[in-house]
């Protein structure tokens, strides 16, 4: 990894290089980073790891190096240092935690997205599609096109049509131009009421009319003279106003025509799916020619509108018609759905479950069929519940897939204002009258009493009720009209497809026609192989539904008595269990809706012969529906009086709780609440919301069926109890448990769980299958990506990989070494000892170990090979090895974690703010930060720079800076051996065998890669190339893009020069003092010897040349005089030569310091420095010459 962000900082100092110029050079290669890249990054097109990716990567890169005739030395990593192990462990732990959090977040987002999509799909409802139904065995998925598939050629017809359109457009424009010219010439010449104008396209008409409007608004007075009489001016204004009004009307009509033209396709599309009663109005919202927005309000299907407006219809059938049964229903469904899928299912006939799914998907077309049938009442569309919505219902219900013979149709309908739900038992009617009844023994029956509900006038008699739960006053009443508002369906809210109209079950008030009984039978088709046998019942079995009217404290009540007599059908006396529902039991509770699945007792939904009876409830008819009304007078006496028929009487389901929900009774259904209905399924021919379940009954003798009757002023809820007499020999578990039967409830829950698991895929629609497949595909893709990411993170370089790589290097004849510790440190020491010409690596740690030449991006196909030198880095950025180590402290590396939120720019600013050598800048920074944290609550120092104000917010560790990090970089454990390396020639045969065993390559493929490399190696080059004689073109150094970084580098380099100048100046001052003391000693020695020679006066420091002489006035004078012929020099040699060198250097440094104060520092200052020259050779020569010149000076 290296130092974070260091390559970004050093990129300005790198320059591109041609790999061909590296021929013959010895380069060290850090193979450890190759192995990590191969293990973590090498993937195939599907994202899976490639087998032996490390060997394949090494093979190709070796071929590239040998092709350029480069002599590589590979270096393997040894044992990781302690600091590196600690840092990598912490980093890996932090990365894993972040990865886990990211995966959890992605899962939450995915679940949220899927829930939203499911809700949207549920709200959108079913839409008719003209596409063929896909096969259930394989749902087609959109495949990616082949890269090499060419686009189809354009047809000549398309070209001709485009030319025709262009021609028509030109004609329109010419016509428009002519009309405009005529109008401008004479405004009255354009007649907007003419047929010629009306035949124009709406776009042209709109432009002409708008031009006319603008023209008449501005230039009317040019063509119409003002009235001379002031009294006629009002007429003039009124005339213009009328013309303007006509023009505006015409413009509005044209705009409507344009809107109709734009929205015609949308309107046609929706009309084909049912149509809209309201118009689609479009308006332009933005100034874009290609954009058009359509706002559709009040969407309502024409079928639904017709159903809402249609009056209640009487349910009357001729007795000669064949009644509908629950038997052979799926066979009828198969016949019904065959025309819909002949094109897609000719090869193999679909299974019954497939027919169910297809029938659910074509719900819209079935609604259309119901609309055309006269016997369907006005509110058939109540069941327009989307399959996705019903799927949510299925999750709380269970379905027995095997071994169950009785399937009961249940429809879930709830109220708009109430949220609780309830399961309901449905008896519906339809138009299929061709089905016959199949009993358990296989016999068939014709039109019989079990399917006919007859109402005779003689049955409308008063009867006495002796039940304890009934009120005292009882009167007989026919089933007249049951009406209930629709409920708000779950998951749909305001956008549900269920219409808001009230559902009605109408019995004609006229009961004189006894020969036309009412046939109420479910005719939802099912397959013949799933036949529903009728249930043998007891002769005395009776179901009574009591409907009290709670409008007052002592109000009237009604009850519906369902009696069943099985004597005429020849049934056995097997009992039927009871359904129990408590008033406070929650509706649609999955845990309470189960009964034992092992019992064979099922309830027949066929109420045979609904008839109002007088005294006896069992007289010749199998099943009778009695409607009686009981009231209790204030006196408490029991009075019987006949109830007059009221066609507006309403009966609804509910409980005696005022907050209970409404359960509607549809024209095709008599709905009875039942908590034991489970495993429902959407399957309908005339109602889309039918749910098919298996119902079994418990051992309880009482059935609580909840009704609700709305009063005149407010809605009230009452409790009803249906008493069913019969044998209680069944072992089913009742839904209403006592406190002493906890085990029965647990058994019920366990059996339901088993049913949920076994029948999860029992019935599913086409849309659900497609959605499920898409969701699974997305989930699979996500899991694959997650698995690949986890494998990439967990992948590590093993020792076996290193051994295999070394084996391949031996086959190619390439030398390699195993470093004691870090491979980068070993490569750096090879560079420092001139054993290599550089290192091929992408790890920036190598600079901290002292490398001088680095080649980066050598094997990157999208980038040039970059060459970096330590000298360029030092000259352009002012960074040396110690500063690079300090950057590692701040940015983070394999040895230290760094400071959070500190990048390479901020790190350079820190080094600029705190200059120094070694770790001194970091120590100063830590001390300043500690003081700043102590005074954090106080006002900040106004003298602090902007950088320091930002640095106050950083968080430093207590151990910062750790000296062990710098020691690890400055003194790494390396092999300092300087033994020579040797290279061999590749063994072709061994390499072929290696590639065949590891890569599975054939001999031909190996030769295609390897033979060009061997040919290049064998090429003998005796003549030198021209680039060996001429220096290559110099690459211009890239500038620093960041202004902050540029400022920090400039200031840091200036500070370094100032520090160096101060050090040199201090050294020069010390040297000058030593020189002065030495001169004084020499002068004293000369006087003591009695010489008369007089020394020239020393000039002061101010008299010297501002450029800085070498050692004073004597040397300055001698440099301006000619030398004597004998070449003798002055006695300057009496001064030590080292002193002369130091003073000459001090003079040069003084000139540089003076120049630096005038000019601004830049990165090029180091190149303009004056080369220091030693003055010693200038004064070497014979002593006689020097003495002669001195005597000449004295005489003068």
Curated annotation (Swiss-Prot):
Keyword rRNA-binding tagged: no
Chain span(s) of sequence motif Nuclear localization signal 2: 1179-1196
Biased composition (Basic and acidic residues): 734-755
Any single GO BP term: nucleotide-excision repair
PROSITE patterns the record matches: XPG_1, XPG_2
Enzyme class (EC, first level): hydrolase
Binding site for Mg(2+) 2: 843, 845, 894
Cellular component GO terms, alphabetical: chromosome; nucleus
Region (N-domain): 1-78
Biased composition annotated in UniProt, kind: Polar residues: 311-321, 722-731, 1142-1158
Cited Gene3D superfamilies: 5' to 3' exonuclease, C-terminal subdomain, 5'-nuclease
GO MF assignments: DNA endonuclease activity; metal ion binding; single-stranded DNA binding
Quaternary context: Monomer. Homodimer.
Function recorded in the entry: Single-stranded structure-specific DNA endonuclease involved in DNA excision repair. Makes the 3'incision in DNA nucleotide excision repair (NER). Binds and bends DNA repair bubble substrate and breaks base stacking at the single-strand/double-strand DNA junction of the DNA bubble. Plays a role in base excision repair (BER) by promoting the binding of DNA glycosylase to its substrate and increasing DNA glycosylase catalytic activity that removes oxidized pyrimidines from DNA.
Written domain comment of the UniProt record: Both nuclear localization signals 1 and 2 act as a monopartite signal which binds to the high affinity site on importin-alpha. Both the spacer region (also known as the recognition (R) domain) and C-terminal domain are required for stable binding to the DNA repair bubble. However, both domains are dispensable for incision of DNA bubble structures.
Protein name in UniProt: DNA excision repair protein ERCC-5 homolog
Species in which this protein is naturally found: Xenopus laevis
Lineage per the UniProt record: Eukaryota, Metazoa, Chordata, Craniata, Vertebrata
